[in-house]
Amino acid sequence: MKILVTGAAGYIGSILVPRLLQSGHKVTALDSFIYNQSSLLDCCYDNNLDIVRGDARDKGLIQLYLKDVDAVIPLACLTGAPLCDVDPVGARTTNFDAVKMILELRSREQIVIFPTTNSGYGVGQKGVYCTEETPLNPVSLYGRLKAEIEKVLLSSGNCITLRLATAFGISPRMRLDLLVNDFTYRAVTDGFVVLFEARFKRNYIHVRDIAKTFLHCLENFDKMKNEPYNVGLSDANLSKMELCEEIKKQVPGFYFTESEIGEDPDKRDYIVSNAKIEKTGFKPDISLPQGIAELIKGYRVIRKNQYSNV
């Protein structure tokens, strides 16, 4: 299959593109390389890879590279609430307008597999699992834009949307602003963290399992199409406090406490059911403890927090 991946050198794309190539697909990897990342260099030997430096909002560029592909995976995104708040215009043009443009330019036969976020659930009911039928209630611009474009995607047909849990794990284009990655980094470098809203819960998924999900969708597209799917670890609906307790099992000297004053601007608090995608045969490979162990090793290499989106 010929696949166009936008944002291909980002945190997810840097894991996904090699997996697509290993599976025999031909990949056009488009990225602006705004972080000067070299995360796809190791793939350049592969004749099935073409790398394009450019902006996913460039209509002429997208038209050109859409011509001969079977599938599009639009990863180009200003990811996370803080970054979207810093650049709301860039957030809308990248996270909404650019994806809508792909839908308008593609042929009806070309499929789209799109990563949205389970952040769209916002604040859930205590003790009630959010399913794909749960009304979306985003609490940030990032979440709202993802929810809006998902609605457009599903109405356009011939697509799958993936409501990804909070990602974690090592990637060649590393990010330390993700919660598990951040807390583990603090544990091994600072030895402590002060928590705000420590009881707020969310779901987690390893970046390699996110890549696996895209491959699963490509292989099972006909039976999965035109539906949203939650993607996360069913045994990892954890509060910040519970996450720190998991990290402490591997970093015994890690100290964490909840602040009695102040609050976290991130108000997300929900638990998620991943039963729908599991019924299609998908099963994550990497547990949260395995991911934490991986991060601890990785942070022996990374010594400064230069890997964030803001």
What are these regions (language model features)?
Residues 56-93:
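NAD(P)H-binding glycine-rich loop region in Rossmannoid oxidoreductase-like domains
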Residues 1-71:
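N-terminal Rossmann/SDR dinucleotide-binding element
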Residues 126, 139, 147, 151-202, ...:
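NAD(P)-dependent short-chain dehydrogenase/reductase
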Residues 74, 100-139:
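Conserved Rossmann-fold NAD(P)-dependent oxidoreductase catalytic core, especially the SDR/UDP-sugar
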Residues 190-191, 195-310:
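C-terminal substrate-binding subdomain of Rossmann-fold SDR/epimerase-dehydratase oxidoreductases
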Residues 39-41, 82-89, 123-127, 172-173:
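Conserved catalytic-core motifs of eukaryotic protein kinase domains, centered on the activation segment
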Residues 6, 30, 72-75, 112-118, ...:
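SDR active-site strand-loop-helix element
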